[in-house]
Curated annotation (Swiss-Prot):
This is Isoprenyl transferase. Binds 2 magnesium ions per subunit. Mg(2+) binds at D38, E225. The active site is at D38, N86 (proton acceptor). GO terms for molecular function: ditrans,polycis-undecaprenyl-diphosphate synthase [(2E,6E)-farnesyl-diphosphate specific] activity; magnesium ion binding; manganese ion binding. GO terms for cellular component: cytosol. It comes from the Bacteria. The gene is uppS. Substrate binds at residues 39-43, 51, 55, 83-85, 87, 89, 206, 212-214. It comes from Bacillus cereus (strain ATCC 14579 / DSM 31 / CCUG 7414 / JCM 2152 / NBRC 15305 / NCIMB 9373 / NCTC 2599 / NRRL B-3711).
Length: 258
């Protein structure tokens, strides 16, 4: 079942936010949270601003949510930053989006290192501009020994493409005698995905009021809890993430059982 902005904190105005955080941390925190960051363009349009202004503001929210997820002891935070379909957007917007990782990491990387955050990237990196790849590679290299939160960017990522690529690699290994067809299993296919070293997301969040998955981690979210909110990504705050996690904690996850 899916909820929007379920008001678990209604009536608790006299309670400090820090106290609420500590209360939530006493419950089970999802190991892996994935977020479809949506609504940057519409946020800007409502303010008569260019779409790129929304993307810039959205990156500031990434900083806040990353720090807060780390504080909550979330182990993996995957952010859908740019899909394989996003190349269809206006060139000016795409060019700006390709510059954002360099701008973002140029200022935020020292804090990520200090916070013990490890940066990873999934997606088709070969199509990314050189300056974008270099920024991501530097961040991954500089944080590879960090043992805290894994900040995983899905950049030029499409789930169908990921699954097709995994099957192609499995077929190649089968032809070379590395695996036998009777050995193929869900676990084996998972091991060929870009997320093979990560747990599957337990909680998937999408902002902006859209109720779809948009070709994001289709295999990995088979048993994820979905949480949708009408809030645009630039307006997404720590309180919203805490609300989503509290909602998650109140759900019964039966995985097909009783």
């Amino acid at each position: 079942m899916m909820f929007k902005n379920f008001p678990f904190f209604k009536g608790k105005k006299d309670t400090s936010f820090d106290h609420l955080v500590e209360e939530v941390k006493k419950g089970y925190i999802p190991e892996h949270i994935a977020i479809i960051m949506d609504g940057n363009g519409r946020w800007a349009k409502r303010r008569a601003m260019p779409r790129i202004a929304g993307h810039h503001e959205g990156m500031q929210v990434v900083k806040k949510i990353t720090k807060f997820a780390s504080k909550l002891n979330v182990k993996v935070l995957t952010l859908y930053a740019f899909s394989t379909e996003n190349w269809k957007r206006p060139k000016k917007e795409v060019d700006y989006l390709m510059k954002l990782p360099e701008e973002f990491l140029g200022t935020f990387l020292p804090e990520l290192i200090e916070e013990n955050v490890q940066v990873r990237v999934i997606g088709q990196k070969d199509r990314l501009p050189t300056h974008t790849r270099r920024a991501m590679e530097k961040a991954m290299e500089d944080t590879k020994e960090n043992t805290g939160l894994i900040l995983n960017f899905a950049l030029n990522y499409g789930s169908r493409d990921e699954i097709v690529s995994a099957v192609q690699h499995m077929m190649k290994d089968n032809e070379e005698g590395k695996i036998r067809s009777e050995e193929v299993s869900e676990e084996m296919l998972s091991s060929y995905l870009m997320t093979s070293s990560l747990p599957d997301p337990e909680l998937l969040i999408r902002t902006s009021g859209e109720l779809r998955i948009s070709n994001f981690m289709l295999w990995q979210i088979a048993y994820s809890e979905f949480w949708f909110t009408d809030v645009y990504w630039p307006d997404f705050k720590e309180e919203h993430l805490l609300n989503a996690i509290t909602d998650f904690q109140h759900r019964g996850r039966r995985f097909g059982g009783v």
